[in-house]
Amino acid sequence: MAKKSKIAKDKKQREIVAIYAEKRRALKEAGDYQGLSSLPKDASPVRLRNRDSLDGRPRAYMRKFGVSRITFRELAHKGEIPGVKKASW
């Protein structure tokens, strides 16, 4: 489990990206790179890190399910992910 401060920081950063998204798009289309550089650093979507939606783990993130491999395994064993079952052959 990630530190609560990291999870909170990630949430705040995503909100900032959403707030400035339209303004960034307009500045990029206009080619106003000076204006882009005046925006906050955290307004750039490139700085976001994919994190597990349940416990905030930043590594081994599975984009399709939005969780880390560890959480995915636990949820799959419990049968809480539709269409996923243990392989058997």
UniProtKB/Swiss-Prot annotation:
Its Gene Ontology molecular function terms? rRNA binding; structural constituent of ribosome
Q: How does it assemble?
A: Part of the 30S ribosomal subunit. Contacts proteins S3 and S10.
Identify the keywords attached in UniProt to this record, alphabetized.
Ribonucleoprotein, Ribosomal protein, RNA-binding, rRNA-binding
According to UniProt, the name of this protein is Small ribosomal subunit protein uS14
Identify the taxonomic lineage of the organism of origin: Bacteria, Bacillati, Mycoplasmatota, Mollicutes, Acholeplasmatales
Originating species: Acholeplasma laidlawii (strain PG-8A)
**Coiled coil region boundaries:** none
Q: Which gene encodes it?
A: rpsN
UniProt keyword rRNA-binding present: yes
Q: What biological processes does GO assign it?
A: translation
User: What functional role does this protein have?
Assistant: Binds 16S rRNA, required for the assembly of 30S particles and may also be responsible for determining the conformation of the 16S rRNA at the A site.
InterPro entries hit by this protein? Ribosomal_uS14, Ribosomal_uS14_bac/plastid, Ribosomal_uS14_sf
Q: Which domain of life is it from?
A: Bacteria
User: What family does the Swiss-Prot or TrEMBL record give for this protein?
Assistant: Belongs to the universal ribosomal protein uS14 family.
Question: GO CC annotation: what is one?
Answer: cytoplasm
Alphabetized PANTHER family for the sequence? 30S RIBOSOMAL PROTEIN S14, SMALL RIBOSOMAL SUBUNIT PROTEIN US14M
